A protein has these predicted regions:
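Short beta-strand/loop motif that positions the catalytic acidic residue
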Residues: 225, 231-233, 237
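N-terminal cap/lid segment of alpha/beta-hydrolase-fold proteins
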Residues: 22-75
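Mobile cap/lid helix-loop segments that gate and shape the active-site cleft of serine hydrolases
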Residues: 55, 187-221, 227
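Catalytic nucleophile-loop/oxyanion-hole region of alpha/beta-hydrolase
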Residues: 93-95, 100, 115-150, 275-282
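C-terminal catalytic histidine-bearing segment of alpha/beta-hydrolase fold enzymes
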Residues: 246-295
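Primarily recognizes the serine-hydrolase "nucleophile elbow" in alpha/beta-hydrolase
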Residues: 134-199, 213
């Protein structure tokens, strides 16, 4: 009898927890939200069977609906548009940090779109890529109403979002690639000693082959047509080692791609879009200055 009661209590707790997760809504100040496709209407599905939910920190999990959160400045100072790709280890999407970055960009007069992408769910690697490509197309197709130049749509991503930004930069046909890429402490390599293995577990699955690891270690995908790129990171990052950025930067330089890299002495991991980072003003200034160097 006690075992039955205990089981019922566990079930009740699970239902209550799930309901609480579903009840949390994303808090944002976007000027417009566009629901794009979902697992039923997109070219590919991530085969997610659980309900999508958001936790109290603004992290989205089990994502099955692609959404664009559009931030438009009241007084535009740039004709560029930045697709913001939040990180989360490919196990979640840290929307709250993406929103904070977009708010800062809006204050600087730059239009941005925060992408809630569908997660790869242990091996559906094409899903986050096609969502990012869809966001690029949307921005270009709606350039007039967004007040931007369709040839100046770039991407910004941190951590696994940085991998996604490099992913779309290196796996997309040249004519459709982003105009530029901003990589912040990005996951780049799937090497078991150097990379963030959890991200590769979610992206490629736990039974991935060495050939897949090599293909999706994105320093191996750089060519002369890879978009101009800036990398920002901290030297003491113990989540995604700085060697990830170094490998990508080395490949960019090898192929003559316009690129630069800034390494802060401290800060660890996850500081972009998070209050309290010692070098927040510095990375903001460095990024804005770099954007000004682009045509």
């Amino acid at each position: 009898m006690k075992r039955v009661i205990f089981t019922l209590l566990l079930a009740l707790f699970a239902v209550t927890t799930t309901s609480a997760q579903k009840a949390v809504e994303l808090k944002h100040t976007a000027d417009q939200v566009v629901k794009h496709w979902n697992n039923q209407t997109a070219p590919h599905s991530n085969q997610e069977t659980k309900d999508e939910y958001v936790n109290e920190k603004g992290y989205a999990f089990c994502t099955s609906q692609t959404e664009f959160y559009i931030y438009k400045p009241s007084t535009p100072k740039s004709d560029k548009c930045i697709i913001v790709l939040p990180g989360g280890g490919y196990s979640g999407v840290v929307m709250s940090k993406g929103f904070r970055i977009a708010e800062w960009l809006r204050d600087e007069g730059i239009t941005s779109i925060v992408l809630k992408y569908r997660l790869p769910n242990y091996g559906h690697k094409e899903v986050p890529l096609e969502d990012t490509q869809a966001a690029l197309r949307y921005a270009r197709e709606h350039a007039t109403e967004l007040g931007i130049d369709p040839a100046k749509v770039g991407v910004l991503g941190g951590s696994a979002g940085g991998h996604l930004a490099a992913y779309v930069s290196t796996f997309t046909p040249d004519a459709e690639k982003p105009a530029f890429a901003i990589l912040i402490y990005p996951v780049i390599t799937g090497d078991s000693w150097l990379g963030h293995i959890s991200s590769f577990n979610y992206l490629l699955g736990k039974n991935r082959t060495p050939e897949q690891v090599e293909q999706y270690s994105l320093q191996n995908r750089v060519t002369a047509t890879t978009p101009p790129t800036i990398l920002l990171l901290s030297d003491d990052d113990n989540v995604v080692p700085s060697i990830n950025s170094m490998l990508y930067y080395k490949a960019l330089k090898h192929y003559g791609v316009k690129s630069t890299m800034y390494t802060f002495p401290s800060g660890g991991h996850g500081w972009a879009g998070k209050a309290g980072f010692k070098y927040e003003k510095e990375w903001h200034h460095l990024l804005l200055d770099w954007l000004d160097t682009l045509k």
